[in-house]
Curated annotation (Swiss-Prot):
Residues 331-546 are annotated as: B. It holds the Pfam family HATPase_c_3. Molecular chaperone. Has ATPase activity. Its main location: cytoplasm. Residues 1-330 are annotated as: A. It comes from Rickettsia massiliae (strain Mtu5). Residues 488-497 have a biased composition (Basic and acidic residues). One of its GO terms (molecular function) is ATP binding. InterPro entries: HATPase_C_sf, Heat_shock_protein_90_CS, HSP90_C, Hsp90_fam, Hsp90_N, Ribosomal_Su5_D2-typ_SF. Belongs to the heat shock protein 90 family. Residues 547-623 are annotated as: C. The keyword Hydrolase does not apply. This is Chaperone protein HtpG.
Length: 623
């Protein structure tokens, strides 16, 4: 009997999801069973964990189970568990508001295109709300472990829900009654639903029972043993796939499956997956890791534990430890030596698998890198990472060969006498290919790696070498393409002579530009462009400085060096005029500097003056 009832409105965000569920065109609607079974299993896992320190919570009912029943006459599917249960506040928070960050990410990804948005349903998994794809009303009855009150939550998904106190006789746990839509009544077919439940339950460690058609006898559908505890030889590829999909709310198949039992000083079992598709929350501010920690088959936590490094947060799966005590507090897991050893072993194993894939399946590895390379490179900024091992699995775009290559491949293709790894960073690889910074290097068939992820500008400041080879930006002032492959005394002498010979030219540019530039030098790397900006070895890289300005970490850009190409016709003309004592090229000098700034993505100091100079030159050309 209902005692008191409150009517409430869903959060606006929940309303958006429910609207999509109710009008869903998603073809694989049966995932609602996956979501509800997974939630029921989680509820049992949570109570099993809490009962380790408070056995009264499971007094008289310590055998966890999930039951599924079809009531065809009333058009209902009933899912029942004896897990942790919910009180009134829990029902409001968990079912009336956005309680799961993954669901919030789902909302952010909605495009307004119904076809695309329906595809997102399968990629995200939206938990309980998926019920409304097949039901026009959902009734949830729940009693929280350790509490006496029973509460009933009910909604048709059309903007409002009710929460009621009830004096109904009800044991601990949660019961969900789905009132199935007429057009979805095929889900009331006993054999079809049994098949669906079985397909989603085989890996669940809680026994799942399905009532027969008469509604009297329970038939256990799953083995109720944790999948990772079984020998690999007894697990099919399909079982691995289904476990992965249930665990990660995914529709893709795993790219790599790692099922290992570690024996020795530290005993643990891991069943880990690398997805084949990019996860939507990879760069979410929460940066949550999706690997669950179990201790002796008891679920402990998947939050706020340092089980895997942040840069491997794309991993999905479970780790089950034999060495940690069951009664360990979550706070004690923060700096636990056993957990640290498990983390190191897993990291080593994952990097080993990636190295193997990179060598054996480069095309597959390129796809993986496009999805997760940005996250993986974050590890190069962390002090505790084995940077060289991580760099071994990194790949980058080659400017010379227009394909992804590793640092080891780059080194193997060094030109004779070359000892430095060159790179250029920017937002767009096509723009980088046309940059004057690398034209000289490429003309000598010296490769340049193109860095286009923001994280690249950070990790190169931490990792200046790889296997004793310097990693150097092509924007540096001291690059001499002639000396890159030869260190002869003769070329050093020629270089000094060149600087002295063009002193008249560099002084004129410096006098004209003043504080807009730090120094003006003769370039040893340009072959066709008139000029480019450059920075000294001690200075911050240009793109890194720009990023810090955007983030308001520093106030203003520093003055850059301007490098001139004496073989360029424009520079040659200015130099010849100077030798003839003609110093009337100030506007052209400013235009050359402005052009160098634009090519480097730097702001022009005076856009009005730049526009006037450009117009003047165009007018002279056509008159």
């Amino acid at each position: 009997m209902i005692m008191t009832q409150e009517k409430k409105k869903f959060d606006a965000e929940v309303g958006k999801i429910l609207n999509l569920m109710i009008h869903s065109l998603y073809s694989n609607k049966e995932i609602f069973m996956r979501e509800l079974i997974s939630n029921a299993s989680d509820a049992c896992d949570k109570l099993r964990y809490l009962s380790q320190s408070n056995s009264e919570l499971v007094a008289g009912d310590s055998n966890f189970k999930i039951t599924v029943k079809v009531d065809k006459d009333n058009g209902q599917i009933i899912i029942r568990d004896n897990g942790i249960g919910m009180n009134k506040d829990d029902l409001i928070e968990n079912l009336g508001t956005i309680a799961r960050s993954g669901t919030a990410n789902f909302l952010k990804s909605l495009s307004g295109d119904s076809k695309k948005d329906n595809m997102l349903i399968g990629q995200f998994g939206v938990g309980f709300y998926s019920s409304f794809m097949v039901a026009d009303k959902v009734t949830v009855t729940s009693r929280k472990a350790g509490e006496d009150k029973v509460h009933i939550w009910e909604s048709d998904g059309l903007g409002e829900y009710t929460v009621s106190d009830s004096d109904k006789e009800f044991t601990r746990g949660t019961e969900i009654v789905l009132h199935i839509k007429k057009e979805e009544d095929t889900f009331l077919d006993h054999f079809r639903l049994k098949h669906i439940v079985k397909s989603y339950s085989d890996h669940i460690a809680v026994p799942i029972y399905f009532f027969d058609e008469a509604g009297n006898n329970e038939i256990q559908l799953n083995s109720a043993s944790a999948l990772w505890t079984r020998p690999k030889s007894e697990i099919t590829e399909e079982q691995y796939k289904e476990f992965y999909k249930s665990l990660s709310y995914a529709v893709d198949d795993p790219w790599i499956t790692m099922h290992n039992k570690n024996e020795g000083a530290i005993e643990f079992t891991n069943l880990l997956f690398i997805p084949s598709s990019k996860t939507f929350d990879l760069f979410h501010p929460d940066r949550k890791r999706r690997v669950k920690l179990y201790i002796k088959r008891v679920f402990i936590s998947d939050e706020n534990i340092d089980l895997i490094p942040s840069y491997l947060r794309f991993l999905r799966g479970v780790v089950d430890s034999e060495d940690l005590p069951l009664n360990i507090s979550r706070e004690s897991l923060q700096h636990n030596s056993v957990l640290e050893k498990i983390k190191n072993a897993i990291t080593k194993r994952v990097l080993g698998e990636l190295r193997k894939k990179k060598e054996e399946s480069p095309e597959e590895y390129n796809k993986f890198w496009a999805n997760f390379g940005g996250a993986l490179k974050e590890g190069l900024c962390e002090a505790t990472t084995d940077h060289e091992k991580l760099l071994e699995v990194c790949i980058f775009r080659s400017a010379l060969h227009n394909k992804m290559i590793s640092l080891d491949e780059y080194i193997a293709n060094f030109k004779e006498g070359q000892s430095t790894i060159y790179y250029l960073s920017g937002d767009n690889p096509d723009k980088l290919l046309s940059s004057p910074q690398i034209e000289g290097l490429l003309s000598k068939e010296i490769d340049v790696l193109l860095f286009t992820d923001t994280v690249d500008d950070f990790w190169v400041n931490v990792n200046s070498k790889y296997k004793e080879h310097a990693i150097k930006s092509a924007t540096r002032s001291d690059i001499d393409v002639e000396q890159t492959t030869s260190q002869s005394e003769e070329k050093n002498t020629d270089s000094k002579k060149s600087d002295d010979e063009y002193k008249l030219l560099t002084d004129y540019f410096k006098e004209t530009l003043g504080e807009l530039v730090k120094e003006v030098k003769i370039s040893k790397k340009l072959t066709s462009s008139p000029a480019c900006l450059a920075v000294s070895d001690a200075a911050m890289d240009i793109r890194m400085e720009r990023f810090l300005i955007e983030q308001k970490q520093i106030a203003n850009a520093s003055a850059k060096n301007l490098e001139l190409n004496p073989k360029n016709k424009i520079i040659e003309k200015i130099f010849n005029d100077l030798k003839a004592n003609n110093k009337n090229n100030e506007e052209l000098v400013n235009l050359i500097f402005d052009q160098a700034c634009i090519l480097e993505g730097e702001p022009v100091a005076d856009t009005g003056a730049f526009s006037k100079r450009l117009n003047d030159i165009v007018q002279k050309a056509i008159l």
